[in-house]
Amino acid sequence: MKKIHAIVGGVAGGATAAARVRRLDESSEIIVFERGDYISYANCGLPYYIGETIKDWDNLFVQTEESFEARFNVDVRLRNEVLSIDREKKEIQVKDLLKNEVYTIKNDKLLLSPGAEPFKPNIPSIDDSRIFTLRNPEDTKKNKRLYNIKKC
């Protein structure tokens, strides 16, 4: 039976780990769970897109879901959020955010690379509409619209 590697998070760390696991083990099943809409994007390039140093949106993406799956033989599950991990049973509970369905996957190996959440310090006016965080492509689109309106 094939060994199953489950990787939580599909941006820089998770995508790199999936590619490395594939190089080390050509026969295992590798599943990447990413709750967002994109895999393997250049998150350090996001401010450059807003500031128009990077003009083409597609240049932010190292791989698409399809190209990553084809190149590394990895099952990429975008818009799938890991809800819980049972280390004893070696199972993870996952929610497909598009279908609004919850399912369970067994795994032999589990790697966690879920990313981060922006920190907003408790200071006056932190919730002002002109203050924003930047962590992912969704934030980038929103902030780019604001930038174009305000030309800040």
Predicted regions and their residues:
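FAD-binding core/adjacent interface of flavoenzyme oxidoreductases
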Residues: 2-6, 66-152
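Beta1-alpha1 glycine-rich phosphate/pyrophosphate-binding loop at the start
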Residues: 2-75
